[in-house]
Amino acid sequence: MKETPLSNCERRFLLRAIEEKKRLDGRQTYDYRNIRISFGTDYGCCIVELGKTRVLGQVSCELVSPKLNRATEGILFFNLELSQMAAPAFEPGRQSDLLVKLNRLMERCLRNSKCIDTESLCVVAGEKVWQIRVDLHLLNHDGNIIDAASIAAIVALCHFRRPDVSVQGDEVTLYTPEERDPVPLSIHHMPICVSFAFFQQGTYLLVDPNEREERVMDGLLVIAMNKHREICTIQSSGGIMLLKDQVLRCSKIAGVKVAEITELILKALENDQKVRKEGGKFGFAESIANQRITAFKMEKAPIDTSDVEEKAEEIIAEAEPPSEVVSTPVLWTPGTAQIGEGVENSWGDLEDSEKEDDEGGGDQAIILDGIKMDTGVEVSDIGSQDAPIILSDSEEEEMIILEPDKNPKKIRTQTTSAKQEKAPSKKPVKRRKKKRAAN
């Protein structure tokens, strides 16, 4: 399923807001979205939320044979999956260009930077080493996947504990967590990716772009850095030309953001370890009980509306007060009335019922003036409006027509019994034939 394209109005609105240094969620140019880290019950499982972008990280390990050219080093493997649950545009089971690019960037950021001591993963040189596998699943896509994935990967690696082993001769003994405490991985530093989106050919810059901003950006710059301000990798995409000053400015901003995120990660790991030692609730169990994972709510963004309120007050002060409109019904004639403004509402005039007589089988219309009918319809004082009209329970159809005159005096009624009472006598008309004189 292809993603829904942006309309021209949405595109122009986003670009105009960026030119005015405004964002849809109320952030400033260099602001990051709120980051939340949750840990699972087992070691090495975590969920990282970057705004509405959610990534699940899971680390696993197994004993395998090492590579031939690196007999004393362990193996580190990364796998990022984009499912349709995150966005309908992602196709399952297909290696898209975006997925390949993200996986390669993760490998350069974490594996090539030597953030993990792979030699400590060796059990028996040339025979047994630990293979560490990091699986990342995108749960919801709202932009900036690489930043959320890098944070989830490094958090899961820091939180992971591998089983302890012992080697006696040719025998390798693997201990369960009940027998011996698991051993954490040896991590030298924590590289974190920071993304910068460029607009209008590098004129405008935004940190941590969301999904809508990514669709209108001209280029993307990703800088992976640790808290020691050591650049691990840099990647530029989009085909834009960046100046040296722009790259240096982005590196300075990335250094500040990485320091803040690293402090947040260390604090989250410390709190989780403290809760586990105390024996309290930890992991997703506590989050599900409080409906923190299953419930999705909109975050409140602080937005300054003072300028808009002042402008609205000025417009209201300069505008003329609205006129009071009172709608009262006006009685023009006993049969007509007008409510509000517009076309008058009145009783409709009815033409002579000649056509109805033909359709009704030749029934005649009888004009009555204050008489009593045999059919059960009593009309006494027609000029008075308060006089009631009494109808009988006769099975014959009865119809009373009201005229819009001020003092209606005639009522036309049509019944089937009237034909029997006053049926006009029709006499045959004889015509004389004239004889022509014979020539």
Curated annotation (Swiss-Prot):
Cross-link Glycyl lysine isopeptide (Lys-Gly) (interchain with G-Cter in SUMO1): give the residues.
K297
- Taking the record's annotation, the residue ranges forming a coiled coil are none
Residue positions, PTM N6-acetyllysine: K297
| Residue segments, region ARE binding | 1-268
Q: Where is the composition biased (Basic residues)?
A: 425-439
- MF (Gene Ontology): 3'-5'-RNA exonuclease activity; mRNA 3'-UTR AU-rich region binding; RNA binding; RNA polymerase II-specific DNA-binding transcription factor binding
What is the protein name stated in its UniProt record?
Exosome complex component RRP45
What biological-process terms (Gene Ontology) are attached? Answer: exonucleolytic trimming to generate mature 3'-end of 5.8S rRNA from tricistronic rRNA transcript (SSU-rRNA, 5.8S rRNA, LSU-rRNA); immune response; mRNA catabolic process; nuclear mRNA surveillance; nuclear polyadenylation-dependent rRNA catabolic process; nuclear-transcribed mRNA catabolic process; positive regulation of cell growth; positive regulation of transcription by RNA polymerase II
Q: Which domain of life is it from?
A: Eukaryota
Question: Whom does it interact with, and what assembly results?
Answer: Component of the RNA exosome core complex (Exo-9), composed of EXOSC1, EXOSC2, EXOSC3, EXOSC4, EXOSC5, EXOSC6, EXOSC7, EXOSC8 and EXOSC9; within the complex interacts with EXOSC3, EXOSC4, EXOSC5 and DIS3. The catalytically inactive RNA exosome core complex (Exo-9) associates with the catalytic subunit EXOSC10/RRP6. Exo-9 may associate with DIS3 to form the nucleolar exosome complex, or DIS3L to form the cytoplasmic exosome complex.
Describe the function of this protein: Non-catalytic component of the RNA exosome complex which has 3'->5' exoribonuclease activity and participates in a multitude of cellular RNA processing and degradation events. In the nucleus, the RNA exosome complex is involved in proper maturation of stable RNA species such as rRNA, snRNA and snoRNA, in the elimination of RNA processing by-products and non-coding 'pervasive' transcripts, such as antisense RNA species and promoter-upstream transcripts (PROMPTs), and of mRNAs with processing defects, thereby limiting or excluding their export to the cytoplasm.
Where does this protein have compositionally biased stretches of type Acidic residues? 349-361
Which UniProt keyword terms apply here? Acetylation, Cytoplasm, Disease variant, Exosome, Isopeptide bond, Neurodegeneration, Nucleus, Phosphoprotein, RNA-binding, rRNA processing, Ubl conjugation
In the UniProt entry, the disease listed is: Pontocerebellar hypoplasia 1D: An autosomal recessive neurologic disorder with onset at birth or in infancy, and characterized by progressive axonal motor neuronopathy, severe generalized hypotonia, respiratory insufficiency, and cerebellar atrophy. Death in childhood may occur.
> Gene name, please?
EXOSC9
Q: To which protein family does this belong?
A: Belongs to the RNase PH family.
Report the principal subcellular site: cytoplasm
Q: Where is it found, in Gene Ontology cellular component terms?
A: cytoplasm; cytoplasmic exosome (RNase complex); cytosol; exosome (RNase complex); extracellular exosome; nuclear chromosome; nuclear exosome (RNase complex); nucleolar exosome (RNase complex)
Q: Where is this protein localized, as stated in its record?
A: Cytoplasm; Nucleus; Nucleus, Nucleolus; Nucleus, Nucleoplasm
Position(s) of the covalent cross-link Glycyl lysine isopeptide (Lys-Gly) (interchain with G-Cter in SUMO2)?
K297, K419
